[in-house]
């Protein structure tokens, strides 16, 4: 019994092995090319090699004694060869294409009969247009190829991975994160604000001082000092273009415009220093009841330095005005004529509005006169001085007079506090008059003095140096600043006449010469402002300041004579 059962098991196992193993000379088909029964059991058919002449059942169907039917096969769900190619990376064109397998060849050409499935492998299909399109460069790509030439992976390579390999990124342009997005803003100017705000630019390149044509009034000139020269230009592309055009205009401007702007650049900080020095003198220990017994620390050199600097700059401005015929050396403004024609009529505008010639002009003639006068006022073509610069010169002179008045007042109070007269053997006589050449750090106690009263000798020496420095300033601006004052009056009168129009009526009188004051500070009288009204803040205040300064000089001299025994 046991031997019989073992024999049956061995026989069954041998039969199964014979069924599993293909017989010799049989062609092993794929599951898809097998018959319906074998495909249902997911087995491969074994078709005898001798049965190519007609429909021959497979070995399994023959042993099972069932009909072997090769039914119609369902179409495969796999995409075709043309659709599988775009799924490969973009660089697939450089890789060799894989050779077709026998299974795929038989699957593509297999028919409903076993003779077709058992035939030899057909030749590979000819290369499609996709291979040619992939092997071409982007420049030679044509529209005749398939629409799905580039897949989504190429976009990811371009937008993320390709940024680090972009030739537009220069070394050192990657940030700490290494994402490489900086080239997107640096290469394309999509945002002008990021370009300007992120870079530290030279203020002299992105912003240049305006030309005199752009400064019609003194207020605008003073307002330019409050601008932050380190700020960026406007954030719009139009503003940037305007800045570049303005820079080119300033570069190509004539020498007259640049020289007219240079004194303004020097006058603005100099006037600021004058204001600070006056504040220090008025709030120092020499003011009020706590007046010390000695003036050894008095900053005489700083006052002399301000006088020297202001006289040099103001001399350049007024020399230019005199050369242009805007004012004479004695402070008398000449007649300035601007001609404009309207048909057959001619109008003449002078610096005196009461002497207008001609009848009322039309709007076109008024516009022509206004443009002509504006050009002359700005000092563009005629090489003159604009109103803003003239006002700065006159304002600087007034600040200097206030500084001198404070210094002389301190000397006067100090001399008045000294008790009794002291003998002196000529101390201070022949003192140095080289005031403008003194050091800015010079103190009153450092001045030379001889005799038994050194304080009186030093004050006498300082007074002589201050007189010499002020005499040089008035040599440039006229006595009492008459040249600068009359230049301002002439410019303002002409501007007022042009704004009212030719023949439009009255104006202000020109600045006349004033009476002199005693000593150094005697000044000229002021004139009325535009419109015929007298401005106390103009010439009249100048006369008061100058006369007051002259009175202080005389008072200090009398006190020195009294204390020194002369």
Curated annotation (Swiss-Prot):
Low complexity composition bias: residue spans: 1-30, 89-108, 359-378
Organism: Hapsidospora irregularis
Subcellular location(s) per record: Nucleus
Known role: Transcription factor that regulates the expression of the gene cluster that mediates the biosynthesis of the tetramic acids Sch210971 and Sch210972, potential anti-HIV fungal natural product that contain a decalin core.
Annotated DNA-binding residue span(s): 35-68
GO cellular component: nucleus
The protein, known as: Transcription factor tasR
Alphabetized GO MF terms: DNA binding; DNA-binding transcription factor activity, RNA polymerase II-specific; zinc ion binding
Cross-referenced InterPro entries: Zn2-C6_fun-type_DNA-bd_sf, Zn2Cys6_DnaBD
Key words, A-Z: DNA-binding, Metal-binding, Nucleus, Transcription, Transcription regulation, Zinc
Residue span of region Disordered: 1-31, 72-174, 346-382, 422-453, 500-551
Domain of life per record: Eukaryota
Coiled-coil intervals: none
Amino acid composition bias (Gly residues), ranges on this chain: 501-532
């Amino acid at each position: 019994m046991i031997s019989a059962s073992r024999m049956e098991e061995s026989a069954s196992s041998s039969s199964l092995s014979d069924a599993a193993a293909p017989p010799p000379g049989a062609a092993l088909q794929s599951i898809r090319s097998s018959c319906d029964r074998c495909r249902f059991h997911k087995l491969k058919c074994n078709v005898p090699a001798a049965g190519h002449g007609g429909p021959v059942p497979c070995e399994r169907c023959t042993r099972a004694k069932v009909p072997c039917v090769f039914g119609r096969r369902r179409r495969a769900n796999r995409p075709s060869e043309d659709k599988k190619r775009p799924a490969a990376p973009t660089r697939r064109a450089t890789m060799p294409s894989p050779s077709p397998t026998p299974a795929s060849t038989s699957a593509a050409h297999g028919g409903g009969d076993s003779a077709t499935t058992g035939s030899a492998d057909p030749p590979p299909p000819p290369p499609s247009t996709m291979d040619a399109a992939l092997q071409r460069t982007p420049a030679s790509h044509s529209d005749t190829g398939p629409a799905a030439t580039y897949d989504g992976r190429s976009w990811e390579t371009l937008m993320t991975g390709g940024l680090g390999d972009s030739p537009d990124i220069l070394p050192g342009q990657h940030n700490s994160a290494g994402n490489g997005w900086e080239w997107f803003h640096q290469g394309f100017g999509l945002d002008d604000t990021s370009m300007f705000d992120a870079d530290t630019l030279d203020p002299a390149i992105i912003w240049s001082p305006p030309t005199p044509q752009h400064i019609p009034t003194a207020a605008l000139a003073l307002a330019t000092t409050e601008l932050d020269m380190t700020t960026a230009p406007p954030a719009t592309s139009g503003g940037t273009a305007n800045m570049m055009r303005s820079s080119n205009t300033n570069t190509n401007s004539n020498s007259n415009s640049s020289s007219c702007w240079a004194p303004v650049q020097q006058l603005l900080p100099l006037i600021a220093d004058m204001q600070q020095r006056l504040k220090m003198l008025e709030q120092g220990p020499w003011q009020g009841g706590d007046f010390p017994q000695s003036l050894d620390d008095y900053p005489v050199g700083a006052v002399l330095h301000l006088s020297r600097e202001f006289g040099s700059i103001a001399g350049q401005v007024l020399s230019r005005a005199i050369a242009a015929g805007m004012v004479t050396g004695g402070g008398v403004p000449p007649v300035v004529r601007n001609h404009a024609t309207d048909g057959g009529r001619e109008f003449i505008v002078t610096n005196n509005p009461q002497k207008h010639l001609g009848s009322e002009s039309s709007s076109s003639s008024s516009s022509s006169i206004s443009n002509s006068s504006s050009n002359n006022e700005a000092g563009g073509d005629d090489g003159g001085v604009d109103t803003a610069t003239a006002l700065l010169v006159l304002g600087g002179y007034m600040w200097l007079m206030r500084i001198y008045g404070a210094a002389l007042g301190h000397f006067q109070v100090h001399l008045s506090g000294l008790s009794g007269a002291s003998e002196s053997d000529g101390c201070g006589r022949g003192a140095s008059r080289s005031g403008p050449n003194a050091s800015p750090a010079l103190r009153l106690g450092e001045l030379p003095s001889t005799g038994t009263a050194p304080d009186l000798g030093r004050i006498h020496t300082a007074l002589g140096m201050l007189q010499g420095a002020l005499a040089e300033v008035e040599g440039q601006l006229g006595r009492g600043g008459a040249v600068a004052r009359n230049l301002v009056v002439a410019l303002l009168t002409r501007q007022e006449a042009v704004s009212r129009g030719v023949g439009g009526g009255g104006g202000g009188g020109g600045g006349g010469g004033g009476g002199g004051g005693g000593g150094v500070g005697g000044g000229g009288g002021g004139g009325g402002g535009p419109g015929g009204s007298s401005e106390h803040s103009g010439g009249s205040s100048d006369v008061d300041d100058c006369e007051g300064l002259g009175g202080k000089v005389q008072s200090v001299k009398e006190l020195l004579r009294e204390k020194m025994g002369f």
